Swiss-Prot record:
Formation of pseudouridine at positions 38, 39 and 40 in the anticodon stem and loop of transfer RNAs. Keywords: Isomerase, tRNA processing. The active site is at D52. Its EC number is 5.4.99.12. It comes from the Bacteria. This is tRNA pseudouridine synthase A. It comes from Dictyoglomus thermophilum (strain ATCC 35947 / DSM 3960 / H-6-12). It catalyses: uridine(38/39/40) in tRNA = pseudouridine(38/39/40) in tRNA.
């Protein structure tokens, strides 16, 4: 068996997420459809991050195994995949890796970014790629909020609850980068719970708009609550940035 590792990017707005779903257009589904055509076998694609509907990726990583190479070099497969895949998926790199490499379980750190366009006037060309907020955000409060999330916390109040054995997550990096009207949040961790980054961003925006207090956000991180601190931020601003192995 040959184990292929592929790095790719995609625009998430017309996908029902990464993971294959019956009757839905997904990134995994598009990849597997083209790979079956090329290798003449059913192939299961494994993704490092299972992005939700509308979420983009700049550095998603997948792996899949084939019985034979079908005379595909890494360079040739890179070119053919980019030719056959739809225009909202771009292959960035193709490698052959050790048999034990697993895109999801071998990952050491996942990075996400979230993009906010903070301007009174809307920008139609950014609409599907960010969260437009037309009221001014307090950047100092955003920075202070981001610092609260560093370290190990129970994120039960900041995710969609599924059958998780453990909702404790260690956040390695949590910071904002500001460039004029673009406010970009960077966050990294070994893994994330479902919609966790979007709930984190939504909560920071509540503080940044001065709708809620920074001290209240700190309490939510320490104590389990029945109600949410905020709604999740829209999917359009979220990007799977890169995966560290």
């Amino acid at each position: 068996m040959i184990n292929w590792k592929v790095e790719l990017s995609y625009i998430g707005k017309d996908f029902w997420g990464f993971q294959k779903q019956p009757g839905k257009r997904t990134v995994q589904g598009e990849l597997e459809k083209v790979l079956k055509l090329l290798f003449d076998e059913d192939i299961k694609v494994i993704g490092a991050g299972r992005t939700d509907a509308g979420v983009h990726a700049l550095g998603q990583v997948v792996n899949f195994k084939t019985k034979e190479s079908k005379n595909f070099s890494c360079d040739k497969l890179y070119k053919v995949l980019n030719k056959l895949l739809p225009g909202d998926i771009k292959i960035k790199k193709v490698e052959i890796v050790d048999d034990n490499f697993h895109a999801r379980y071998s990952a050491k750190r996942r990075w996400y970014i979230y993009v906010i366009y903070n301007n009174e006037e809307k920008n139609l060309f950014l609409r599907d790629y960010c969260w437009w907020i037309n009221k001014p955000l307090d950047k100092d409060l955003l920075n202070l909020s981001a610092n609260l999330f560093k370290g190990i916390h129970d994120f039960r109040n900041f995710c969609v609850i599924e059958n998780y054995d453990n909702t404790n997550v260690e956040i390695y990096e949590s910071f904002w980068y500001f460039k004029e009207d673009l406010l970009i949040y960077f966050v990294s961790a070994p893994f994330f719970l479902r919609k966790m980054v979007r709930f984190i961003v939504g909560s920071m925006v509540e503080v940044g708009l001065k709708k809620k207090e920074l001290e209240d956000l700190e309490k939510y991180l320490k104590d389990r609550k029945e109600e949410r601190f905020s709604s999740p931020a829209p999917a359009s601003g979220l990007y799977l940035f890169k995966i560290d192995y």
